[in-house]
Amino acid sequence: MLSQKHRLSKSADVIKTTARGRSFFNPYFVLKIAPATGTEPAKLTVVASVRVSKRAVDRNRLKRIIRETVRPSITNFKSGNYAFLLKSSALKLTAAELREQVTKSLIASKALKA
């Protein structure tokens, strides 16, 4: 589980991130990144709507996998707000494949500190 300081939990912040953030597309999710001002820690949220799956079990599984993939390295993220918007095609992936896709997207988006 992500620590409280690394969670993007306010609805207004999530809306700002999804509306104004830079988009990095992937067949399985969209990564939105909104840079923060100052030295705030990186904050993350994972959004899985009912369009992804009607079953909450499936949506929560995907969210857990992404959060646990990011958790060990979130202190190495550049300051900003990060939102993963899941697509229904992510259900077809195994946990290892989804972790690999998340890692590739973070590297491609240059979200990690040098």
Descriptions of predicted regions:
Residues 1-114:
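Positively charged, solvent-exposed patches that mediate nucleic-acid binding
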